[in-house]
Amino acid sequence: MEDPESLGFEHMGLDHRLLQAVTDLGWSRPTLIQEKAIPLALEGKDLLARARTGSGKTAAYAIPMLQLLLHRKATGPVVEQAVRALVLVPTKELARQAQSMIQQLAAYCARDIRVANVSAAEDSASQRAVLMEKPDVVVGTPSRILNHLQQDNLKLRDSMELLVVDEADLLFSFGFEEELKSLLCHLPRIYQAFLMSATFNEDVQALKELVLHNPVTLKLQESQLPGPDQLQQFQVVCETEEDKFLLLYALLKLSLIRGKSLLFVNTLERSYRLRLFLEQFSIPACVLNGELPLRSRCHIISQFNQGFYDCVIATDAEVLGPPVKGKHRGKGPKRDKASDPEAGVARGIDFHHVCAVLNFDLPPTPEAYIHRAGRTARANNPGIVLTFVLPTEQSQLGKIEELLSGDSGAPVLLPYQFHMEEIEGFRYRCRDAMRSVTKQAIREARLKEIKEELLHSEKLKTYFEDNPRDLQLLRHDLPLHPAVVKPHLGNVPDYLVPPALRGLVHPHKKRKKPLASKKAKKAKTQNPLRSFKHRGEKCRPTAAPS
């Protein structure tokens, strides 16, 4: 039930164009962080806001930022076009996401407000051309912004009025401390600033001293995750590693988990092991690999959000592992791209309409659990989190329970009522599938994905034109078969379905595939060997003898 005293968007004094964009996004009322932060920001106050993942923090700073920029252009003196707002985020994916949200909110004032994202690893010359047009809002990671400031592609000292630091609790742990301190030297002495964070830690306090001036602190009295009426959280104890694979197979193949799902594991190798295991049973899934280029990772997320596939396997090891301070940050060509913090995607990325989060591997820290679970039950949508636990992981599970239960002490991770003995008939199938997914198969699968990226890389297109033999070597290499797929494993005989589920699940029913493109149909009809149909010679009627 809506609080009658809560403040709606229409009562915040927002520009009618922003209100129209908010309506188009389907937001009937502001979230708690938006309701509290937007009026204070419009009063010109600095903000230090903490709110849980998925609570609408991006819009909480984007709406007042756009309102202040529009108001200045409408009522202030005519001045030269310049960069007025800077948004700092820890990763390239978050920069792309922030830019997208700001552009959606500015849809009806796109002529007045221009937004540029300079976080992508593009040529500096092309980004320089964008910055020379002096967009109103610039979004990027601290390292990329500092690089453009040092090259004089971007000048903020005389024009910037607003600074936003999103996911502030991650910036220092990602090794951006030195970049931030250097970047602040290029900013004016007076500006309004917003710090948005999911947690308050020592890094956030240090940022507060560097960036904010007499801020208002919003520490909302809300749980870090939605309540049980919106988010259901379960844990299931698996006696062995084999039991985890068996249970996951049953949940997905028998459609006990429906809708779009995120599967979290702790290492990239485990991601591919799980994907190859699921492929044995014709269960499609893709791996969100931090080693792949930004464009490829964003394309995976985009297709997942559009419903092209229902299952993504991800890891937060790159993002939520041990903190990496700036002075120890790796430099040079030997730096591992997979551990590059700007390549991480587990925290803060907006996966749309995720119905379930499956922690196939127990999160390494309680905070990691919070951020994984925050990918579902966003806004007012329901969600479920299911965590697989081995007997040796009970102590770590207890730490997660302690963080979730808080002062009440009431259990939050409820036991998932599942009788493993009912799916024992599937064990031999899972055992065979696990046996076929060897380390060599995993290595070949990763190699195959990298080769495909090379073939589709825009940057390498010119190289392959000059060196066609290298392209032929890639294309004519032996076909990779990461695991021996047995077609019959894609079907589930009725006698193997647990008695309690017979008639309720339809394991034979496959997801409807999109119709073949017109181009493919045309190619088939133009191929005489594929389109020719021999019907035999028809007997001609003969004239009756006279």
Swiss-Prot record:
Phosphoserine: residues carrying this PTM: 126, 531
Motif (DEAD box): 166-169
Domain of life of the native organism: Eukaryota
Record's keyword terms, sorted: ATP-binding, Helicase, Hydrolase, Nucleotide-binding, Nucleus, Phosphoprotein, Ribosome biogenesis, RNA-binding, rRNA processing
Record-listed E.C. numbers: 3.6.4.13
Domain (Helicase ATP-binding) ranges: 38-218
UniProt biased composition (Basic residues): 505-524
Membrane-spanning segments: none
Alphabetical list of InterPro entries matching this protein: DEAD/DEAH_box_helicase_dom (IPR011545), DEAD_box_RNA_helicase (IPR050079), Helicase_ATP-bd (IPR014001), Helicase_C-like (IPR001650), P-loop_NTPase (IPR027417), RNA_helicase_DEAD_Q_motif (IPR014014)
Catalytically driven reaction(s): ATP + H2O = ADP + phosphate + H(+)
Pfam family, one: DEAD
UniProt-annotated location(s): Nucleus, Nucleolus
Positions bearing Phosphothreonine: 141
UniProt-annotated stretches for the region Disordered: 323-342, 504-546
The Helicase C-terminal domain, residue ranges: 230-424
Keyword Metal-binding assigned: no
GO MF annotations, alphabetized: ATP binding; ATP hydrolysis activity; RNA binding; RNA helicase activity
Biological processes per GO annotation: rRNA processing
Family in the record: Belongs to the DEAD box helicase family. DDX56/DBP9 subfamily.
Functional description taken from the UniProt entry: Nucleolar RNA helicase that plays a role in various biological processes including innate immunity, ribosome biogenesis or nucleolus organization. Plays an essential role in maintaining nucleolar integrity in planarian stem cells. Maintains embryonic stem cells proliferation by conventional regulation of ribosome assembly and interaction with OCT4 and POU5F1 complex. Regulates antiviral innate immunity by inhibiting the virus-triggered signaling nuclear translocation of IRF3. Mechanistically, acts by disrupting the interaction between IRF3 and importin IPO5.
Subunit and interaction comment: May form homooligomeric complexes. Interacts with IRF3. Interacts with OCT4 and POU5F1.
Protein name in the entry: Probable ATP-dependent RNA helicase DDX56
Organism: Bos taurus (Bovine)
